[in-house]
Amino acid sequence: LDVLVNNVAFQSPVDDFMELTPSQWRRTFDVNIDSFFHTIRAAVPHLTGGGAIINTGSINGLRGNKQLIDYSATKGAVTALTYSLAQSLLERGIRVNCVAPGPVWTPLIPATLPADQVGEFGRQVPYGRAAQPDEIAPSYVFFAAEQLSSYYSGEVLAPIGGETLPG
């Protein structure tokens, strides 16, 4: 195994913190961070001679989001996991980095947003729209290609549509 990409997410917006149920909280953590732990743990013995682990975070993990509290918490955990594993796996020659994009148009969007909000998705960023997946893909290629990123580990690349600060 040369490269592991962790790219999974569940989100369910709430209008008020008290709407966030313990079961939703647990499900979000199960999908968005616990799965990363288990996948990485299974992959590390197969990343012999180095390799790369690329975790998918989110701008919401860097700045929070009042309607995506659980999602934001898990993506913040992804960032911390990336930093910690970059240190822990350095002696094995494994680079660990994170791509933390802003809004990206994926099947998750119409599946989780109310229909009247789907058309507005991503309009808040300076580019005025969500990214397309192929606009984010080069971030993963960069971290996967040893000849491009051999000196990078513990980094978070945030393609966020023209924003200059994560807050």
What do the predicted segments below correspond to?
Residues 58:
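Residue(s) in the substrate-gating loop at a strand-loop-helix junction
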Residues 98, 120-148, 152, 159-161:
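C-terminal helical subdomain
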Residues 11-14, 63, 148, 153-167:
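Short C-terminal tail/terminal secondary-structure segment
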